[in-house]
């Protein structure tokens, strides 16, 4: 498309979304559930065709030299599609929060004042790589009574088109407007610039992808932005802790899957347990091919681990989101230094402490400035599905409006409602 056509095309998407948003907002819980269950069924019925479309994206990605983590994020396996279907079903079974009134109270004047939860209206979603985000965003849009415009990465265009077609079918089956969820069908990057500059039609933009993408959108957008920044997640092994449990959790947090933003990228270890803990986790990482970039003190312990891939950490390593079998390792004096290190280098996504000390755990929960803070659990649990939110639109590292996994409530706002019986202000 030429520039003029891109402007006209995105404008039409905005107009159609705005019209559809009114009908989406009025939809009953039963109608929205019908659409979600239809989408779950269609996903299961179309696993093979979806994988055929996905294969074209994967072949193109490999030919274009995309990194292994990026290719992994592109892959639509039967397990990934089943998780998407289950997310739709979980959302369908959840209570509908739209229209609920909270905090209703009687005022001295006689009026009653409360707040009603309502859809945002239209949100734009810009994301890279993961085609399953198309389903996560669409299903949350349906459940929350919003319309949305989705712009996936060019590397996943065939997969996204196929998934968006299923969403349109599910909406039609439920009697909802097919324009309630729209996919930007062009890979022209100018479409992104137009989408983030349509305040008359788009109420909020949610970018999900690399740091460069999110910084660009945050800088150029003319509508509010809910940011999903990178995930430099930390696991801190405290003194005292259950060493066996700590080894198990630190292993899972790093090696369960390397490409998600909730994988741990930095391992902090209290000096008092380092000599016992590091050789055990080091042996596991070595066996799985994980490179350990450590401080001099940690390397002195890890050098005895057979087959260990070791390197001295640089200052940049403490801030790095690897999305790969690499982890930075640092020995700290204790919980004070761990908290200070995390608050300095973390991306404020998800950080965990593994400890037997209740006071250390409470301090960590209070003082670590991240969207999700965990005690004795893997950072890999930082996920809307695991948190019982159904699907998630992303994990916000912002402090306003939505923070952490953004589910249904993150796609709503509250308006004041006032109920009276003829009261007038004196």
From Swiss-Prot:
Question: Which NCBIfam families does the UniProt record give?
Answer: PRK00197.1 (NF001221), proA (TIGR00407)
Read off the InterPro entries from this record: Ald_DH/histidinol_DH, Ald_DH_C, Ald_DH_N, Aldehyde_DH_dom, G-glutamylP_reductase_CS, Glu-5-SA_DH, GPR_dom
Keywords of this protein's UniProt record, alphabetized?
Amino-acid biosynthesis, Cytoplasm, NADP, Oxidoreductase, Proline biosynthesis
- Identify the PROSITE patterns for this entry: PROA
Q: What is its main location?
A: cytoplasm
The protein's annotated pathway: Amino-acid biosynthesis; L-proline biosynthesis; L-glutamate 5-semialdehyde from L-glutamate: step 2/2
Q: What is its EC number?
A: 1.2.1.41
Q: Does the keyword NADP apply?
A: yes
Alphabetically, the GO molecular function entries are:
glutamate-5-semialdehyde dehydrogenase activity; NADP binding
Q: Quote the protein name from its UniProt record.
A: Gamma-glutamyl phosphate reductase
What GO cellular-component annotations does this UniProt entry give? cytoplasm
The subcellular location is: Cytoplasm
Any one Pfam family match given in the protein's UniProt record, by short name: Aldedh
Catalysed reactions, semicolon-separated: L-glutamate 5-semialdehyde + phosphate + NADP(+) = L-glutamyl 5-phosphate + NADPH + H(+)
Is RNA-binding included in the keywords of this UniProt record? no
Q: Name one GO biological process term.
A: L-proline biosynthetic process
Q: What class of enzyme is it?
A: oxidoreductase
Q: Which family does it belong to?
A: Belongs to the gamma-glutamyl phosphate reductase family.
Q: What does this protein do?
A: Catalyzes the NADPH-dependent reduction of L-glutamate 5-phosphate into L-glutamate 5-semialdehyde and phosphate. The product spontaneously undergoes cyclization to form 1-pyrroline-5-carboxylate.
């Amino acid at each position: 498309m030429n520039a003029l056509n891109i402007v006209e095309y995105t404008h039409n998407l905005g107009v159609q979304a705005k019209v559809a948003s009114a009908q989406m907002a009025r939809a009953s819980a039963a109608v929205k559930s019908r659409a979600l269950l239809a989408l779950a069924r269609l996903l299961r019925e179309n696993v093979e065709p979806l994988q055929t479309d996905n294969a074209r994206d994967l072949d193109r990605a490999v030919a274009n030299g995309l990194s292994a983590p990026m290719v992994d994020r592109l892959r639509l396996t039967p397990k990934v599609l089943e998780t998407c279907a289950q997310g739709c079903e979980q959302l369908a079974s959840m209570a509908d929060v739209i229209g609920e009134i909270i905090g209703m109270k009687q005022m001295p004047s006689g009026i009653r004042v409360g707040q009603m939860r309502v859809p945002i209206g239209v949100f734009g979603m810009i994301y890279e790589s993961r085609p399953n985000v198309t389903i996560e965003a669409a299903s949350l849009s349906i459940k929350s009574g919003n319309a949305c415009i989705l712009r996936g990465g060019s590397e996943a265009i065939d997969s996204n088109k196929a998934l968006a077609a299923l969403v349109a079918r599910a909406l039609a089956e439920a009697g909802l407007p097919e324009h309630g969820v729209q996919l930007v069908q062009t890979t022209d990057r100018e479409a992104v610039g137009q989408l983030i500059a349509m305040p008359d039609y788009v109420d909020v933009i949610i970018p999900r992808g690399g740091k460069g993408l999110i910084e660009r959108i945050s800088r150029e957008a003319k509508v509010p932005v809910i940011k999903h920044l990178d995930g430099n997640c930390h696991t801190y092994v405290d003194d005292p802790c259950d060493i066996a449990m700590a080894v198990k959790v630190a292993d899972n947090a790093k090696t369960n899957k390397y490409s998600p933003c909730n994988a741990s990228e930095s391992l902090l270890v209290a000096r008092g347990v380092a000599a016992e803990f590091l050789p055990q986790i080091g042996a596991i990482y070595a066996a799985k091919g994980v490179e350990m970039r450590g401080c001099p003190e940690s390397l002195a312990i890890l050098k005895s681990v057979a087959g260990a891939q070791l390197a001295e950490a640089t200052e940049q390593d403490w801030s790095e989101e690897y999305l790969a079998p690499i982890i930075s390792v640092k020995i700290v004096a204790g919980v004070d230094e761990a908290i200070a290190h995390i608050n300095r280098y973390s991306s404020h996504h998800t950080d965990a402490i593994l400890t037997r000390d209740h006071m250390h755990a409470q301090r960590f929960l209070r003082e670590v400035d991240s969207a999700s803070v965990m005690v004795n659990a893997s950072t890999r649990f930082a996920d809307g599905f695991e948190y019982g939110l159904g699907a998630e639109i992303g994990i916000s590292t912002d402090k306003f409006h939505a923070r952490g996994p953004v589910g249904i409530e993150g796609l709503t706002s509250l308006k004041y409602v006032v109920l009276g019986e003829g009261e007038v202000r004196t």
